Curated annotation (Swiss-Prot):
Keywords: Cytoplasm, Methylation, Protein biosynthesis. The gene is prfA. Signal peptide: none annotated. PANTHER family: LD18447P. Belongs to the prokaryotic/mitochondrial release factor family. InterPro entries: PCRF (IPR005139), Pep_chain_release_fac_I (IPR000352), Pep_chain_release_fac_I_sf (IPR045853), Prokaryotic/Mito_RF (IPR050057), RF-1 (IPR004373). Gene3D superfamilies: 3.30.160.20, 3.30.70.1660, 6.10.140.1950. One of its GO terms (molecular function) is translation release factor activity, codon specific. This is Peptide chain release factor 1. GO terms for cellular component: cytoplasm. It comes from Symbiobacterium thermophilum (strain DSM 24528 / JCM 14929 / IAM 14863 / T).
């Protein structure tokens, strides 16, 4: 591990030098990439330096214990030795976690898609509540949210919504939300007081930049059409809606929320890049990776990941057997404790694999 850490320190020092290089400073894309990696390695270097300092202190105490000491001094140095050994072990454990393989997409913005599943109007109403839950989470973290497209119904629910959350590391937090979310409650339209079960599917994709994935112009079919609101409201006389098809995969994206065709085209391409990258990533996963993701639960869409039981005021995450109460707080975006537990579970699984 020490050799690996020394390599990290060398890389960090090289990046520090690059950040002052005029050729890097004058290239915004390269500067952003260098700064991002520099920021990521900083905590590892800081922790390793603390580890090295503790090692030196431990050596000093061992040297003192080899010399002549009265009983009281020896007892004090022995206690300090125990404390330093404990500190060294803690730092070593923390460094092992920091050195775990990272998801290369963790630092990216995130594109999320919420779709009402089984349950009719009740599913669409819960889809709207989940959308609010994520926007409230974003507000708490001061993350920027942008709606890319939304389809509502007459019941006040959402059939489907595509939105983007812009924040460094947003994907690292929200990637655990992908899957089937199940709600159990008595719908407002239910006169007999019976509990109904409905489902909503959440897809989570990292935003891909042009440098991450190439979409060739000849692979795209772009159609423009007029966009109109529900019930004929805000009817757009110009052809501003954009329907974009990626021919090799058959993936289709439709954007009509903006008045400008150019804005809808830009949004559609952004979503298409994320979906195409996700499609190829799913195809490329090995059987071992599929098994790991099923165990850890970081995005299998068919997986029933969580149940929101309103009568019992509880939320259960089935992947790790976690149950929390105060469903009102959860629906108001207080889900960091659930995300933290999922992240810790993934860390433990990765550590076990590294040490196997």
């Amino acid at each position: 591990m020490k050799q690996k850490l020394e390599g990290v320190v060398q890389r960090y020092e090289d990046l520090t030098y690059k950040l002052g290089d005029p050729s890097v400073i004058n290239n915004p894309t390269e500067y952003r990439q260098v700064a991002r990696e520099h920021n990521r390695l900083g905590p590892i270097v800081e922790k390793f330096r603390a580890y090295q300092k503790t090692e030196r202190e431990l050596d000093d105490v061992l040297e003192m214990l080899e010399g002549p000491l009265d009983p009281e001094e020896r007892a004090l140095f022995n206690q300090e030795l125990r404390d330093l050994k404990e500190k060294l072990q803690t730092l070593s454990d923390e460094l092992r976690i920091l050195l775990l393989p990272r998801d290369p997409n963790d630092d990216k913005n995130v594109i999320m898609e919420i779709r009402a599943g089984a349950g009719g109007d009740e599913a669409s109403l819960f889809a709207a509540e989940l959308f609010r839950m994520y926007t409230r989470l974003a507000e708490r973290h001061k993350w920027k949210t942008e709606v890319l497209s939304i389809s509502e119904n007459e019941a006040g629910g959402i059939k489907e919504v595509l939105f983007q959350i812009n924040a460094e590391g947003a994907y690292s937090r929200l990637k655990y939300e992908g899957g089937v979310h199940r709600v159990q409650r008595v719908p407002v339209t239910e006169s007999q007081g019976r509990i109904h079960t409905s489902t909503v599917t959440v897809a989570v994709m990292p935003e891909m930049e042009e440098v991450d994935i190439e979409i060739k112009p000849e692979d795209l079919k772009i159609e423009v059409q007029r966009a109109g609101g529900a019930g004929g409201q805000h009817v757009n006389k110009t052809e501003s809606a954009v329907r974009m098809t990626h021919l090799p995969t058959g993936i289709v994206v439709y954007c009509a929320d903006e008045r400008s065709q150019m804005q809808n085209r830009e949004k559609a391409l952004r979503v298409l890049r994320a979906r195409v990258a996700d499609y190829y990533a799913q195809q490329a996963k090995s059987e071992e990776e599929q098994l790991r993701r099923a165990q850890v639960g970081t995005g299998e869409r068919s997986e029933k990941i969580r149940t929101y039981n309103f009568p019992q005021d509880r939320v259960t995450d089935h992947r790790i057997g976690l149950t929390v109460h105060n469903i009102a707080a959860v629906m108001d975006g207080e889900i960091d404790h659930i995300i933290d537990a999922l992240a810790q579970h993934e860390q433990a699984a990765l550590l076990a694999r590294e040490e196997a």
